[in-house]
Design a protein with these regions (language model features):
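Non-catalytic all-alpha helical scaffold/repeat segments
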Residues: 2-14, 19-56, 60, 71-76, ...
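Conserved two-lobed SF2 helicase motor
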Residues: 63-66
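Short regulatory helix/loop adjacent to the ATP-binding pocket of P-loop NTPases
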Residues: 93-103
């Protein structure tokens, strides 16, 4: 309505529109003039790319609307401002006057709804949101198959690309945090952070600027977009300098763990906080994942750099020797460590669980219900959920979760190993890309190695249709493992086939305990008549095989109550 008001008032002052890029602002104008109420002005709009044309047309007529998107045309417009209606568009950070309309990056919900209307799936949207930072200018590049559009204009300037290298590797940081400032200076090889800040200010003035600044925070709009754009400007020294710094930042202990759990929420008041900011830790972790996933393609041929190998080294150095404190200190980072080095991460967890004094099991203690309490096992469970999407790591994750599920955790948190495991193997909404055959083999493995847990998993899948509740598990942020998977199955035949597999497993055990028989009785209502008869046959065979009277009494009471 700002534009409609502009035309109705006949104001001689230009309408100033700013956006991430001039192209985005021009696209916005195109959509605006397609609105029925403004169609009358559309045929009078002229977009000027070059100079010397505007004065010639203005001498003949003033019945047109000028759209200026370069400084040269804007200067040429100045003498004609009182005679012509004009719209000036410019990059948001380079605006020299107050903007009338500012096109900010979309919020999460509008962004997702817009992509849904384009037919994009939930996974497509998650990938594009992460890759674009919800910037429509970057999104256009991510969706384009044209190389000229897929590469940002600033990447053609080798000086700008070189200036971007340390910023892309860091990702996000706090400009008021002294430790962050020092680290960025080391990464950029400058004597003072102020020199780097000046570079950032210059980058902010660019059309389609690759960086952002909000309060004390600085960052790169799209790390993936930028790292591909600067690949030719990254040296081997840059990469190994980053790896050294990553070990320093991510290896920092969390002093808050020195406090009692009830007081950790106020760690800042006690001076128990890390030197490096949380946003920098996350940015460094994400870069580690990107180098692991894309490093060989980006830098392998001309630099001989193997990002996957280097990421695995870093993860091992950060976590070994494994302790409960290290796991808690890296709680939020564990999913990214697992994504960066899946095999190395699983090796570390498996070796620990095979030891007599497992440090991982220390995370499974009950969590208190006091205000601001946090769950120390969440990071580990998300890491394992992320690795369960890949069929290659799926069996190992199921085995690990089976072992963790043997530990009874008496608290009211939903984040428990068994919940993650049940969700991964859920017959109607499996949270893995592993096919049905692999999932059935995994359940059989659980019944063999962790029989109590395997039995519970089978029973969990035998639920009333009306009471079924599913949840989405954690997915990798940068790997495409699980891409296109995780939604409820739409074919009843597939669901029914998986259910039959679970039912067959519970009805064909070699031996049954009284507790198992009671479980079968409680599930009679979800079984077809033939399967119900099989349950009664199992109970009868168990009874005549010499079951103790007290066990028979227990099962009889369950039958009396449930049937």
């Amino acid at each position: 309505w700002e534009i409609k008001s502009f035309f109705e008032k006949c104001d001689s002052k230009p309408l100033v529109i700013t956006a991430d890029s001039m192209e985005e602002a021009l696209a916005f104008l195109k959509q605006v003039f397609d609105i029925p109420e403004l169609e009358q002005y559309r045929d009078r709009v002229l977009v000027f790319d070059k100079t010397e044309i505007l004065p010639k047309i203005a001498q003949e007529t003033t019945d047109f609307i000028v759209v200026a998107h370069t400084r040269e045309v804007e200067r040429e417009l100045a003498p004609y401002c009182t005679m012509l209606r004009s719209i000036v568009v410019s990059p948001r950070n380079a605006a020299r006057v107050k903007s009338d309309i500012v096109l900010e990056p979309l919020g999460t919900e509008p962004f997702r709804k817009a992509l849904e209307s384009m037919g994009k799936s939930r996974d497509d949207i998650a990938v594009l949101e992460k890759a674009s930072g919800r910037s429509l200018t970057v999104l256009r590049r991510q969706l384009s198959n044209v190389p000229a559009i897929g590469t940002p204009e600033w990447a053609d300037d080798s000086r700008i690309a070189s200036d971007m290298v340390p910023l892309v590797l860091a990702g996000t940081w706090d400009a008021q945090n002294e430790a962050d400032r020092t680290l960025l200076s080391l990464l950029a090889e400058v004597s003072s952070y102020e020199l780097l800040e000046k570079r950032i200010l210059n980058l902010l003035q660019l059309n389609d600027s690759p960086v952002w600044s909000l309060g004390n925070l600085r960052g790169v709009i799209s790390k993936k977009d930028a790292i591909f754009a600067i690949k030719g400007s990254v040296s081997k020294a840059d990469l190994y300098r980053f790896l050294e710094i990553a070990q320093i930042v991510l290896g920092e202990d969390d002093p808050a763990l020195d406090l009692p759990e009830k007081e950790r929420w106020a760690a800042g008041l006690y001076g128990k906080k890390r030197e490096f900011s949380g946003v920098l830790r996350e940015g460094i972790s994400e870069t580690l994942v990107l180098l692991a996933v894309h490093g060989k393609d980006l830098f392998g041929k001309h630099l001989g750099f193997d990002g996957e190998l280097e990421a695995a080294k870093i993860v091992r150095e950060l976590l070994m020797p494994l302790t409960t404190r290290k796991l808690e200190a890296n709680n939020r980072d564990l999913p990214l460590y697992a994504e960066a080095a899946p095999r190395a991460f699983l090796n570390i967890i498996e070796q620990d669980l095979q030891s007599d004094n497992s440090e991982v099991l220390g995370l499974l203690r009950p969590v208190g219900t006091w205000i601001f309490s946090t769950c120390p096992r969440t990071g580990l469970l998300w890491a394992l959920e992320a690795l369960a999407w890949n069929p290659h790591t799926f069996p190992r994750v199921v085995n690990i979760l089976g072992r963790l599920s043997e530990v009874e955790i008496n608290d009211n948190w939903v984040n428990k190993p068994f919940e993650s495991l049940s969700s991964i193997l859920r017959v109607w909404m499996p949270q893995t890309a592993a096919d049905q055959e692999m999932r059935v083999r995994a359940v059989k493995m659980l019944l063999d190695k962790h029989p109590v847990v395997g039995w519970r998993v089978c029973l969990k899948q035998m639920e009333d249709y009306g009471t079924r509740i599913g949840r989405y598990n954690y997915k990798p942020k940068w790997r495409r493992d699980g891409y296109g998977y995780g939604e409820p199955l739409m074919t009843f035949e597939k669901i029914h086939a998986s259910e039959r597999e679970m039912i067959e497993l519970v009805l064909t055990r070699q031996t049954y305990t009284p507790e198992m028989l009671c479980d079968l009785v409680s599930k009679l209502h979800v079984l077809v008549l033939n399967d119900q008869e099989r349950v009664w046959k199992i109970i009868e065979d168990w009874r005549i095989s010499g079951a103790p009277d007290e066990d028979i009494a227990k099962v009889r009471e369950k039958i009396r109550v449930a049937v």
